[in-house]
């Protein structure tokens, strides 16, 4: 076990949203310990008793002030890396103002009013608004160093030697490939977590994605994570000062 000041003797966490809350994976490199659980909301996610040094969240954190076709620069860069068909898993985020909407019609109106070329919203994106709003209320520029936006398919891209996983995560073959990649990268107990938590409402895909997010959180803590846009380019910020970036 590492000493108290050992950089490996801390927890990091990854989280993936599902209908009833969040599935959270915590990992401690010093002991190789991994924990997995579900929590109800953002307050619980961001006040975990393990006090993780970094939390990688598969959810948009830096929403743009004006929505654009194709989303933010980081969304477009992520799709370019992943190619077709994995790039379709990166969706365009709503404008910040659309997070205040209570109905789909209002969200559409607010999103389209955010900029000259602003598109409407998909129903899938609208259903994410409660989680996006809760994150937006918590994350400040200062807190963004701890709470980071990640994308599981980008994590698997990095694990897979900078190559997208060919198989869909919704197939048995795709799940097998992703489980094998995670096992190679320190998450040998993944199958136990899937068996314990996946119950129909929470799917095996969600548990696998949360492990991928945790892997990127570990890389962030170690200083080895990469990002979209590339680190050679300065990440743009929105009006609230949040960086619009996706880590892997």
Question: What is each PLM-predicted segment?
Answer:
Residues 2-248:
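RNase H-like (RuvC/DEDD) metal-dependent nuclease/polynucleotide-processing core
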């Amino acid at each position: 076990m590492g000493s108290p000041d050992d950089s490996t003797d801390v927890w990091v966490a990854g989280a993936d949203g599902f209908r009833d809350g969040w599935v959270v994976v915590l990992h401690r490199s010093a002991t190789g310990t991994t924990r997995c659980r579900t929590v109800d909301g953002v307050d619980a996610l961001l006040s975990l008793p393990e006090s993780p040094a970094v939390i990688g969240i598969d959810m948009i954190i830096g929403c743009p002030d004006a929505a654009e076709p194709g989303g933010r620069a980081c969304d477009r860069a992520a799709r370019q890396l992943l190619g077709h068909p994995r790039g379709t898993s990166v969706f365009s985020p709503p404008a910040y103002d659309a997070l205040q909407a209570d109905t789909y019609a209002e969200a559409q109106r607010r999103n389209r009013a955010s900029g000259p070329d602003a598109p409407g919203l998909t129903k899938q994106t609208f259903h994410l608004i409660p989680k996006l709003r809760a994150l937006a209320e918590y994350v400040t520029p200062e807190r963004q160093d701890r709470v980071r936006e990640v994308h599981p398919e980008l994590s698997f891209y990095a694990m897979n030697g900078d190559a997208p996983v060919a198989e869909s995560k919704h197939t048995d073959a795709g799940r097998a490939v992703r489980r094998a990649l995670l096992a190679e990268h320190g998450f040998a107990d993944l199958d136990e977590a899937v068996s314990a938590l996946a119950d129909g409402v929470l799917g095996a895909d969600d548990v696998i994605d949360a492990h991928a997010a945790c892997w990127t959180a570990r890389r962030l803590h170690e200083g080895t994570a990469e990002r979209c846009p590339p680190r050679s380019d300065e990440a743009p910020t929105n009006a609230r000062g949040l960086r619009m970036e996706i880590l892997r």
